[in-house]
């Protein structure tokens, strides 16, 4: 089957979050199943520098505007990758979405309209001698591609749109609709208009042949006012084509048995390896070593420092957590207020709280392999990947039972035979502290703790099941000729 993926990022070329992991992992899994999957990304400088394989350049024109498609291979895979090289739009260093001050690039609407426009034309076979059976677009940055393809005469490629996080909707002033040359008839509440603004994400939600999101629970949640971000009515209307498919992870990259970032690798729960990794992590991030029997668990967090992730709950619960003997290792970046609050916590609790602002792949692996518990007190979580890394590394996660966290983490006390982590009863600081205390009681019983770790490490978190689910969806999507 010929499948065109389009996204704004893909690891290891460009990555700011889980979307980058999915764009890499799912395309790789489909290609390994001998499907002709291609990937279209913006030609950010890091992506151009990282492209592998034989590099070809296709000089093309669309809508009377010249551009180049740089063709190569996604590193570590056999996935043919095209980079949309339009220098005024994408030849910018740093974050692909925001300026150095953290503000969205002022021309983001024009940038991602162009990406969607090229994706639609490429999928339809208008640019190169290759045509897709399915166009699979991801998040608001490419959501106009299904809308643009839907307007074409049949036969046309089937369209699938994946919501990775509904909170990011791609909202722009009303005049953007006209400025981009979008058809007037699409400016309706049933079309691209959203409370007087243009919503890129509605190009996928309202017009794609099939919609997916990254867990069954999140697919149900976004059809409610509490999680629907004002789009729950549209999603209920389209519930017949809305599917929840849990993400996988790259089990070769996230493999505790052969992880070059760990001080000691391990294939099963191994207290000695955990102790070695804990010591390496403590030294790396500036924590005191273990302090004997009164020492509590080492808690870890890796993620974006935003309200969604519950970082403020960790800060509020910190005095109680530390009073119980715990230490905290935290890696992330995001909102400046939270970054500064965490720096202050590290200064206030030297040796007990270690904070690294930014992203460091090696440190992320060491946190997974060196901590005793991993904290994910998210207010909502479409899928989550860190809990899967944690389970694979034998680091039981403490999570809010929402979205993909509810689908992948089973509470030890609710289900003693299958439990692999711990659920917060509510997303607040008191619940977080109480749940960590409950988990700590299990942690202090080594034999029982090893059984909990083993259940987590024994799960299958690869892309295999997810890839098969997507293939079934592609085959059953109207308009797909199976080519």
UniProtKB/Swiss-Prot annotation:
GO MF terms, alphabetically ordered: alpha-1,4-glucan glucosyltransferase (ADP-glucose donor) activity; alpha-1,4-glucan glucosyltransferase (UDP-glucose donor) activity
Gene Ontology biological-process entries: glycogen biosynthetic process
Assigned EC number: 2.4.1.21
Pfam families listed in its UniProt record: Glyco_transf_5, Glycos_transf_1
Pathway: Glycan biosynthesis; glycogen biosynthesis
Source organism superkingdom: Bacteria
Enzyme class, broadest EC rank: transferase
Entries under CDD domains matching the protein: GT5_Glycogen_synthase_DULL1-like (cd03791)
Catalytic reactions on record: [(1->4)-alpha-D-glucosyl](n) + ADP-alpha-D-glucose = [(1->4)-alpha-D-glucosyl](n+1) + ADP + H(+)
Protein's UniProt keywords contain Glycosyltransferase: yes
GO CC term (a single one): cytosol
Gene3D superfamilies membership: Glycogen Phosphorylase B
UniProt function note: Synthesizes alpha-1,4-glucan chains using ADP-glucose.
Protein name, per record: Glycogen synthase
Natural source organism: Alkalilimnicola ehrlichii (strain ATCC BAA-1101 / DSM 17681 / MLHE-1)
